[in-house]
Amino acid sequence: MMKKNYYLICVLLLAAFCTTSIATAQNYFGDFPVKADPKTVGNKLSRRLMETKHQLYFDRGIHYAEVCTWYGALRFAELTNNKELIKQLRNRFELLFHLEKDLLPPPIHVDQNMFGCLPLRFYNITKDKRYLDLGLPYADTQWELPANANE
């Protein structure tokens, strides 16, 4: 009988803790100062990306830090249903098929291969096969040791 009561008390305490934690978390993420609101910050970061030149990895194409920022802006645009931002991000990428083709990073290292997440995400959004064809080689070679690498 005492063992049963012990388990009941543990379950009740756990339930109370979970309920309190959820309520606190919801309140914590709902009370941002105006300038720190996630949507405001996301829009500012995305605008900043669109205003800057490409960040390059020496002479080997677009740097993975830009890829991560670009991907974050794209996911932000999707989650906030900002079709105009998706269009702007896509237009920036379109140049890589033609005028800025020399900025495509070579798939020689995990840092450069990160680039593949962008065309694959754009493929997921648009179903345009050009994005799939560009992104898959980066994904497929991400963990391969390049032929000219020193082990």
Which stretches of residues belong to each language-model region?
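Low-complexity, Ser/Thr/Pro/Gly-enriched N-terminal "stalk/linker" regions
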Residues: 26-95, 129-145
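Bacterial Sec-dependent N-terminal signal peptides
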Residues: 1-26
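Well-ordered alpha-helical segments within folded domains of soluble proteins
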Residues: 62-77, 107-124
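Extracytoplasmic mature domains of secreted/periplasmic and thylakoid-lumen proteins
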Residues: 109-151
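Mid-chain, structured segments of secreted extracytoplasmic proteins
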Residues: 83-121
